[in-house]
Amino acid sequence: TIDVEGREALIRRRGRANIKEQLAILRRAAAQGAQVMVVECMAVQPELQRAAQQDILRADIGVITNVRRDHTDVMGDTLEQICDALCNTVPRNGVLFTAEEEQAGRMSAWAGQLSCAFVPVRPQGDEPALDFPENTALALAVCQHLGVERATALEGMARFRRDPYALSLHRLGRGVFINGLSINDIQSTCMVWETLREKYGLEDRE
């Protein structure tokens, strides 16, 4: 976690991650007088996704980056089923941002049922190379919604410290090691490989 003063603290667990952890984080944020809290939905099972949003977080702003074939054992085999599972986190009477294109119509319908404003986001082409353009565009859109000027948001993004498990590339002699531990599905893996291959001039090998 990162508190309002920018101090980082490890989450120490005795077992697997649990959505109840967010209760303690909410209490800590309230005690520090936080005006905004950014938190990832930890749940993958649809009923727990619903509980995390409706019973614990009750977020005003939701962000669904994309819909990919991930956690198919609990979220469904099709993109439509996975989209429906993710939409359990859509905030009632709130705002939903997404860079997803294929399932955007389905998300918009979910948002409409919950009186939630739907904001599709597309990269403008001038996003800095901090992350994938869609992710940066989403962050900038949410910042703008909260009244943060684009220049201020970009200045803050330029100073952030990357997660040690974030995508990275390391050259080892004549070989290359790609740290892709944060990639969870085949579609994302292929997209990342194509991006890195084009950026660094990598070649496919048998």
Predicted regions and their residues:
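ATP-dependent carboxylate-amine ligase catalytic core
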Residues: 1-62, 66, 70-83
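Short, conserved loop/helix-junction motifs that constitute active-site signature segments
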Residues: 53-59, 88-93, 200-203
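A conserved, hydrophobic alpha-helical segment in the catalytic core
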Residues: 56-66, 130-158
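Conserved catalytic-core segment of NTP-binding enzymes
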Residues: 61-120, 189
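Active-site beta-alpha connecting loops in nucleotide-dependent enzymes
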Residues: 102-103, 181-206
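Beta-strand->loop->alpha-helix junctions that form or flank phosphate-binding loops
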Residues: 116-130, 152-159, 168
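Short glycine/threonine-rich catalytic loop with a Thr-x-Gly-x-Asp
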Residues: 127-138, 162-166, 182
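Gly/charged, well-structured mid-domain segments that form the phosphate/adenylate-handling core
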Residues: 143-183
